[in-house]
Amino acid sequence: MNCKAVTISLLLLLFLTRVYIQPTFSLISDCDETFNYWEPLNLLVRGFGKQTWEYSPEYSIRSWAFLLPFYCILYPVNKFTDLESHWNFFITRACLGFFSFIMEFKLHREIAGSLALQIANIWIIFQLFNPGWFHASVELLPSAVAMLLYVGATRHSLRYLSTGSTSNFTKSLAYNFLASILGWPFVLILSLPLCLHYLFNHRIISTIRTAFDCCLIFSLTAFAVIVTDSIFYGKLAPVSWNILFYNVINASEESGPNIFGVEPWYYYPLNLLLNFPLPVLVLAILGIFHLRLWPLWASLFTWIAVFTQQPHKEERFLYPIYGLITLSASIAFYKVLNLFNRKPILKKGIKLSVLLIVAGQAMSRIVALVNNYTAPIAVYEQFSSLNQGGVKAPVVNVCTGREWYHFPSSFLLPDNHRLKFVKSGFDGLLPGDFPESGSIFKKIRTLPKGMNNKNIYDTGKEWPITRCDYFIDIVAPINLTKDVFNPLHLMDNWNKLACAAFIDGENSKILGRAFYVPEPINRIMQIVLPKQWNQVYGVRYIDYCLFEKPTETTN
């Protein structure tokens, strides 16, 4: 682990994974990513996209400043190259992955300097075999970017806790200020324990000076972001405050996060078991006894405690602490291995066994995510290869119904294709469309019709199926009273163009949905423990398909 060649190999593998493998193969795990970030970014780059109520100037709880760095990358790509539109999607993901690599590389160097090179290398291994990080680090979400920025904050926190450097304390807070003001104000919670540490260990005068510097950084960052968002919305738009007001201060039974679903207290423990190998979680608990870093561990547990108390829970809410979990685990693993320094053979056996279990469980989870949940991206990508020589209309309508929430991004659609929603069993508020005429500011500032913050259905967002040119759906039974498209009984000359395998959640067992088991092992388990194994493992797939309604031709 101390060998320079090992370090270089791990970093090269990390770079390859973050910049190529993840952007290419990772899934989109949340429709909020699609409709609240990919679609507005598509509007900035290509002039059209779906619009959620959060982007209505009436509510303005999503930040355009958050999207501007990605627009600045994609604008020259589209201006000076002839790349097809779907490349915007993968280039953006690659940029996120590259940013993740840079943050991880710098933290690796800091861990090596402040703690030990072996701990740093173990941390990289735990980061590589981290199913949660695999998809989170290339997601276009404020919580995902906050996760990456907090790696930068952790780097400076380590330096501060090792040297007492005030400048590194300030830099750590600056990273978190940026993450909070750009779109997710709750990450400020993570800095509270570090602030307490500084307060307890410095004189009043020094604390006041540092507080002034931090307030200045916070104010300048907030001013820049608020001015940017206010220009886009055409009115004063303190987005971070609006998010806090909607989700906490003004939350009620009719509006607020809880109307989108609530989960029990054990949702997050189960989620962590899916996103981290079991040895990493066990080691992370042991790592908190490295008391020199107590402000970091206090941040970790404060975050879990605060979000466990909230009825509305989502996987992405835990993203910012992912790096702390692997850091704590790597410290603990290093200390455990040192207990066996006098028994080198046993030490090597323990090290190899733990790393193999970590890698095996992580790969099982990652392969399951790719195999089970990436069909929507694969199917929508087919539009880039379809022969559009005989385009049937200036605008081609790509429709979907019950599968609306699996739509990945309009970047996967050609320039003249638009996503439309037909009637289905969904009874909440669907996204509408940004206007396509006028300047970008006019499109953003126009008050959309039929928007509300109570998730109330709006019929104005329905599209008649008779005006659909393509349709995306799973080949599964429908609700005959609510769904208007039946993929099992195609009518009106609809043809099946392309399909990809998608997990059948209702008919798959819990382990089959969550983990991939190689077929030889699956067969062995069916022989050894047939009854018990079949109760917990089984995978069934359905087709996720693209259908076309051919144009009528005249002789």
From Swiss-Prot:
GO biological process, one term: protein glycosylation
EC number: 2.4.1.259, 2.4.1.261
Regions crossing the membrane: 8-28, 63-83, 87-107, 114-134, 177-197, 214-234, 269-289, 317-337, 350-370
Keyword Transmembrane helix listed: yes
Molecular function GO labels: alpha-1,2-mannosyltransferase activity; dol-P-Man:Man(6)GlcNAc(2)-PP-Dol alpha-1,2-mannosyltransferase activity; dol-P-Man:Man(8)GlcNAc(2)-PP-Dol alpha-1,2-mannosyltransferase activity; mannosyltransferase activity
Protein topology in the membrane: Multi-pass membrane protein
Cytoplasmic side: 1-7, 84-86, 135-176, 235-268, 338-349
Enzyme class, UniProt record, top EC level: transferase
Domain of life from the UniProt record: Eukaryota
Keyword Glycosyltransferase among UniProt keywords: yes
Annotated catalysed reactions: an alpha-D-Man-(1->2)-alpha-D-Man-(1->2)-alpha-D-Man-(1->3)-[alpha-D-Man-(1->3)-alpha-D-Man-(1->6)]-beta-D-Man-(1->4)-beta-D-GlcNAc-(1->4)-alpha-D-GlcNAc-diphospho-di-trans,poly-cis-dolichol + a di-trans,poly-cis-dolichyl beta-D-mannosyl phosphate = an alpha-D-Man-(1->2)-alpha-D-Man-(1->2)-alpha-D-Man-(1->3)-[alpha-D-Man-(1->2)-alpha-D-Man-(1->3)-alpha-D-Man-(1->6)]-beta-D-Man-(1->4)-beta-D-GlcNAc-(1->4)-alpha-D-GlcNAc-diphospho-di-trans,poly-cis-dolichol + a di-trans,poly-cis-dolichyl phosphate + H(+); an alpha-D-Man-(1->2)-alpha-D-Man-(1->2)-alpha-D-Man-(1->3)-[alpha-D-Man-(1->2)-alpha-D-Man-(1->3)-[alpha-D-Man-(1->6)]-alpha-D-Man-(1->6)]-beta-D-Man-(1->4)-beta-D-GlcNAc-(1->4)-alpha-D-GlcNAc-diphospho-di-trans,poly-cis-dolichol + a di-trans,poly-cis-dolichyl beta-D-mannosyl phosphate = an alpha-D-Man-(1->2)-alpha-D-Man-(1->2)-alpha-D-Man-(1->3)-[alpha-D-Man-(1->2)-alpha-D-Man-(1->3)-[alpha-D-Man-(1->2)-alpha-D-Man-(1->6)]-alpha-D-Man-(1->6)]-beta-D-Man-(1->4)-beta-D-GlcNAc-(1->4)-alpha-D-GlcNAc-diphospho-di-trans,poly-cis-dolichol + a di-trans,poly-cis-dolichyl phosphate + H(+)
Function: Mannosyltransferase that operates in the biosynthetic pathway of dolichol-linked oligosaccharides, the glycan precursors employed in protein asparagine (N)-glycosylation. The assembly of dolichol-linked oligosaccharides begins on the cytosolic side of the endoplasmic reticulum membrane and finishes in its lumen. The sequential addition of sugars to dolichol pyrophosphate produces dolichol-linked oligosaccharides containing fourteen sugars, including two GlcNAcs, nine mannoses and three glucoses.
Family: Belongs to the glycosyltransferase 22 family.
Protein name: Alpha-1,2-mannosyltransferase ALG9
Organism for this UniProt entry: Saccharomyces cerevisiae (strain ATCC 204508 / S288c) (Baker's yeast)
Name of the gene this protein is made from: ALG9
